[in-house]
Amino acid sequence: MDYQHIRYEIHDKIAVLYLDMKDKSANVLSQAMLAELEQVITELEQISGLIGFVMKSAKPSGFVFGADILEFETLTTEDEVRALQENAMRCLTKIETSHLVSVAILHGPVLGGGLELALACDWRLCQQTGRIMAGFPEANL
């Protein structure tokens, strides 16, 4: 299946996922990215012999900057907010409960939902290039 924001390759028994928000300089967890990520994990779980996946950013700017706050501006009802939260939790739970071993390769900003995504993985590794900035800035929103 073709995806807009994620591509992956399989090397031996490991899938390498590249997060790459189309037409953006940085990755954010938009509803489209979350839906694709959930679909990709489901697809990978069906591949016989696959034992795990590595998730990394294809962007030099960093791993994932967090939720797509521009989407927040479009929410007008409590039900829409709840649906957005439930979609995010479903995706993170999919990663946490997958039988596949998951590894997040981190660099640059790993903020808010991006940090939650990294924490949903079994392992987190930091690239030696550059710096890591991890945290939950939404406490200030």
Can you say where each PLM-predicted feature lies in the sequence?
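Conserved CoA-thioester-binding segment of acyl-CoA-metabolizing enzymes
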Residues: M1-K56, T93
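Short, histidine-centered active-site or binding-site loop motifs used for metal coordination
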Residues: L19-D23, T76, E138
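Secondary-structure transition/capping motifs at alpha-helix termini
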Residues: I47, I95-S98, C126-G130
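Glycine- (often His-adjacent) and acidic-residue-rich active-site loop
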Residues: S57-R90, V110
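CoA-thioester-processing core
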Residues: C91, L111-L141
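A short, small-residue-rich loop immediately preceding and capping a beta-strand
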Residues: H99-P109
